Amino acid sequence: MAGKGKTAARTLEDLTLDSGYGGAADSFRSSSVSLCCSDTHLSYAHGGNCWHLTESMHSRHNSLDTVNTVLAEDTEILECSGQCAKLPELEEDVPWSLGEVEGALRKDEELCVGNASREILAKLSALVSRALVRIAREAQRMSLRYARCTKHEIQSAIKMVLSWTISVNCITAALSALSLYNMSTGDKFSRGKSTRCGLIFSVGKFFRWMVDSRVALRIHEHAAIYLSACMESLFREVFTRVQRSALVEKENGVPKFSVESLEQAINNDSELWGLLQPYQHLICGKNASGVLSLPDSLNLHRDQQRAGKTGEGHAYSQAELRTIEQSLLATRVGSIAELSDLVSRAMHHLQPLHIKNPSNGTPVHQNRTGSVHWEPEALYTLCYFMHCPQMEWENPNVEPSKITLHTERPFLVLPPLMEWIRVAVAHTEHRRSFSVDSDDVRQAARLLLPGVDCEPRQLKADDCFCATRKLDAASTEAKFLQDLGFRMLNCGRTDLVKQAVNLLGPDGINSMSEQGMTPLMYSCVRGDEAMVQMLLDAGADINSEVPSSLHKHPSVYPDTRQGTPLTFAVLHGHVPVVQLLLDARANVEGAIQESTENYTETPLQLASAAGNFELVSLLLERGADPLIGTTYRNGISSGPLGEMNSYSLAAAHGHRNVFRKLLSQVEKDKGDVLSLEEMLAEGSEAVERRAPQNEGTLRTGKAKLRALREAMYHSAEHGHVDITIDIRSLGVPWTLHTWLESLRTCFVQQRRPLIQGLLKDFSCIKEDEYTEELITHGLPLMFQILRASKNEVISQQLSVIFTQCYGPFPIPKLTEIKKKQTSRLDPHFLNNKEMSDVTFLVEGKPFYAHKVLLFTASPRFKSLLSNRPAAENTCIEISHVKYNIFQLVMQYLYCGGTESLHIRNTEIMELLSAAKFFQLDALQRHCEIICSKNITNDSCVDIYKHARFLGALELAGFIEGFFLKNMVLLIELENFKQLLYEVPADSPGPGPSYDVLHDLEQTLALRIRSIHLSTSKGSIV
């Protein structure tokens, strides 16, 4: 083995504490290595190089043969179905619908979705829901440290659960969605979160699902955006890989999927198969056949080819490449020295690749990823899980044990080394550390191995302690002493405070750890009331802040910046500690200073999000301002006080009692404060003209109105309709989006009284606020309610809405078809036996005509004349047409137009049928125009049915406009209600089958688009 002798001579400290690469850095000549496929190995579409279980793998002659080593015990493959714990099946409790899944797949134009059946979509949804559960479980564990789930927890969970390649794609999609969301501040309350993010999946549904699943006490809206974008991207990733499978048949160029082909494609994909299994542990790096393979992102073959063309890099031999591959794919080791060498080699090649695909949310930390190294205890812990006692038998000085007390883990459940590194390093990066410790490895083992569990990592001062060799001896000694001081304070013994302070360094009691936290902050996290009091008595700064700069404190967690001891006490819900800090005159707003922007949540925001009524009441009593929001660090904010204030956070999480408590807070100068009703009644411009002495009052009223509008938006998005109705009852106006989301929630929850109240409130929405959402989401929802509900009140209210949306403009008129007559005869020849060459038999009476005219009149006449018998005197019998009606048809043809026709009202419908039968378009249109002028409330249903029977779509469309314009009156008529609610059936006539409600929806959509959404505003009607 290359470099084996040299590695054996190095100490474990050298292998772990130097550059992070151990002996691998000088074992090879360059870090730019391609992992190319050997000709003897099969190449898989989604896995790079694959290693099969062959007889040669039984060899024990080399430690690198630990790749896919097959032990005798492995012949009995683990029956996971009976021994391994399984994930909970979500079934219907997923935050997406099958329609949204199909829409997400069709969003990618390169995907040929075709007509994917509901069976395929349901199977795909069930499989991907397991990935959702895995990501949510990991995010839930990490959220315990700071009692909230942000985008950082979701991102780290994605990196832990998904493979190298898929996680990069999903995080890229999440970053893109969040960027779009942050930039869409102009009309944000009038558009849904998903629309603002460019997503198909509902961000509001994902947020509600995360709250209901208790992923964390507090869910940041960016976390929901990340998770929804990730899952949408994952659906497309899975579908793309299935499409590429050779097992997918094609029908006329369109892929033809089946459940079997879907499962087979996933079984052959080493990056998907384990992810989508139902077991709690995550099977990584191998497919259903047990074949180990490298993911696409670890294959540098193309990069090396490009480097070779430019003269950069170095081409490695097949032996060197095989060594690298075996290092990454090793599943068992025989000793700690062997593991140290394998980890060093793997880190040497994984970290440059990781820098090429950055996905960490903190750029400063990402730039230093190359310095991540493994602590000695981390390697010992990893060796415990990967150790194979049989591999020690190669040593002649070691005699095999005669009695076995332990059962080896079967190969099927052993992950390759690259997966251990991937998960452990993801944990390290999440806590912003530069060294992998033993707890990171234990967390990885809990995820990757069956039957292994450990407690979630707690927030401690030594989380990110690192004695790197880049520090001199004196600095390192000071760090160790400071760490000892933090440990002494964290043990909870108040009698050690003075001794600990002497060890903390020049800043004394206010010294900060690598995480930027003081001893007082850690005591507040633990809820140690006695220690908090001792530290305050010792002079601890009660308003100290976590620094924003990462220069001196590189492991500061992004969402704790500017956090104070009060912030951490509120985060973890320690009411006595909060009371103690407030009594000691801690700033109730945290780190906020007057006239400065707030880049972190205030204690009241955190308490409101968690729904802690006791804490909210306490903070309000001490003067906390519920109107203060958060300004994001990108500088984008729609309001001067920031976003997601306490009202919004309580509403977003569904804490109705907390929201009402915030509303009931009495302003200090109640007599001078404008009420919301006054603000809404007078309007912003009128209020601004008030006396200058009311400027502060004006700002307060405006800020509260803006805060409640924002809260209304979030409560509607997340399905907390009761809170939305509470806000509406205060006089806050609807937007079309919040009204539609509330109506959708009430319909899903079958809350009929609320539906009636919402429908009644539609008239409050101004017509100039109508958007495309009314057509794409509103109309389908309202017609679905009309179809499902036979309630007369709801039907009447919907009729009012449809009539209002149709507008006051007249129904678009039907126009005559100006068709030039190809041939024409004098009316004298009409039904004239002289010179007649064709005779029609109508109701037993002859009707004489001329072929020269009829042959070019229409295709129907041409067919009748062409198919007549050869005998000259044979009559053409016309059935189903009355003699007087046929005479009108012939009069139209001989006169060359409709001007000379005198049609009675009793004849118009029969003439319309005859014109349709003889395919005389101009005559048909003339009849339709006459019908449209004679439509009444009593006759409209019968005329509509006849028009649909004949397939006279123009007339049917006109009558649909009549229905919508007069629906308030028509909905009271029994025959109209029967028309609406009858089950669509195949039409017995020449016209196609129809669904009245669907056709009314389409007609109304066209109308709204023409008069409300077009620039002409009704000029086309």
Curated annotation (Swiss-Prot):
Keywords: ANK repeat, Membrane, Repeat, Transmembrane, Transmembrane helix. It comes from the Eukaryota. Residues 836-902 form the BTB domain. The chain crosses the membrane at residues 160-180. It is a single-pass membrane protein. GO terms for cellular component: membrane; nucleosome. Pfam families: Ank, Ank_2, BTB. InterPro entries: Ankyrin-BTB/POZ_domain (IPR052089), Ankyrin_rpt (IPR002110), Ankyrin_rpt-contain_sf (IPR036770), BTB/POZ_dom (IPR000210), Histone-fold (IPR009072), Histone_H2A (IPR002119), SKP1/BTB/POZ_sf (IPR011333). ANK repeats lie at residues 515-544, 561-590, 599-628, 642-671. GO terms for molecular function: DNA binding; protein heterodimerization activity; structural constituent of chromatin. It is found in: Membrane. This is Ankyrin repeat- and BTB/POZ domain-containing protein 3-A.
